[in-house]
């Protein structure tokens, strides 16, 4: 009795090693008029939002925004106040994708955030944003799916 395995081929994507890019961004922001002056900054917190990614000619372009929330003690009243502001994030990883990669997943995080007061109405924000791009290339997966002449040889599939 000679049996042969039937192989089936499936289209899939193969994940390649991730590409990590860290970018530092700094900007000055004016405290909105509706907020009281800053006496002392208590804490700043940031969250990265990746909005889009484009893949073309071996490069990945990522765009998004960094949402920063600042908690501070107001001048005069001494009470805690907060306000949020948004910083744009644009990054291009040029020439680092293997040829044939047509898809990629992008994730990111804020690895460091520093907010300090330059004066009671102006703050300096310095943020390090880490982007991780995992490229995917089209691939084929071959797996055994059945046995030839199963019925003739009395083979049962469970």
Where are these regions (language model features)?
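Viral structural modules
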Residues: 1-158
